[in-house]
A protein has these predicted regions:
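Glycine-rich phosphate-binding loops at beta-strand->alpha-helix junctions
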Residues: 1-3, 152-155, 159-181, 195-196
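Conserved phosphate-binding catalytic cores of ATP/NTP-utilizing and phosphoryl-transfer enzymes
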Residues: 12-40, 45-54, 201-207
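A short acidic Gly-Thr/Ser loop motif
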Residues: 40-45, 63-66, 167-168
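Glycine-rich phosphate-binding loop plus the immediately following alpha-helix
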Residues: 54-109
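N-terminal glycine/serine-rich phosphate-binding loop of ATP-dependent small-molecule kinases
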Residues: 1-21, 182-186, 190
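Glycine-rich phosphate-binding/hydrolytic loop that grips phosphoryl groups
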Residues: 23-30, 69-73, 81, 183, ...
């Protein structure tokens, strides 16, 4: 395991805990004034951070994120460019691969017919699909997973919105999946320009405030 040294070219290195960097990054980027909020760092994986009166805590995380998306995309379609992947996903139709609730059982409670019942299930009977459709389904699935863990933690903390940092939500195909899943719990996803730098900005801000 590699560790960051305490000195670099005789300059002291200030180390900031990632949880604090995520929470502080969201607070500064979005100029959050609420005493309690939830920040979601959606990057290679996904981490959820809560803030209560400037105390940051790690709610949990999952290994599914942008790394998963690019890895599976490369394995299945030989495409490992995020921009190309996103463009193709937006051109595809995930309904050619995914089964929707309306196709299976109609409405279930508050779940409307267009919600996914099973990702990729239609490939069981038909393996001939375009890369665009595959990437549309894959991007949506990653978005649904991120959206689900986001709204569950929002409900846990009794907030009605989550603030995103990290690069994955720059991919519109993933962001659409996140927002559809958040809407199931009436949770709003908040996105701001430069959110891909949120963790780095948070580390800088936290270091300035505490040193």
């Amino acid at each position: 395991m590699m560790y960051l040294c305490d000195l670099y070219n005789n300059v002291p290195v200030i180390k900031v805990n990632e949880v604090k960097a995520i929470g502080c990054g969201a607070k500064n980027l979005y100029e959050i004034e609420e005493a309690s909020y939830v920040a979601i760092s959606a990057g290679t994986g996904t981490a959820c951070v809560a803030c209560n009166d400037n105390v940051f805590s790690h709610l949990g995380g999952i290994s599914v994120g942008g790394g998963t998306l690019l890895g599976l995309s490369n394995l299945i379609t030989n495409i490992n460019s995020a921009d190309k992947l996103d463009k193709m996903a937006l051109e595809g139709n995930r309904k050619n691969l995914d089964a929707l609730i309306g196709e299976v059982v109609n409405d279930i409670g508050s779940l409307y017919p267009d919600i996914t019942a099973s990702n990729f299930v239609k490939s069981v009977d038909n393996t001939s699909h375009s890369n665009e459709d595959i990437l549309a389904s894959l991007s949506n699935m990653i978005g649904e997973v991120i959206g689900t863990i986001s709204y569950l933690n929002a409900l846990l903390m009794n907030v009605d919105k989550v603030y995103f940092v990290g690069r994955v939500t720059l991919l519109e195909s993933v962001k659409k999946g996140i927002d559809k899943r958040l809407s199931l719990a009436n949770i709003s996803g908040i996105y701001k320009e430069n959110r891909e730098f949120g963790n780095a900005l948070g580390a800088i801000a936290y270091a300035k405030e505490n040193n």
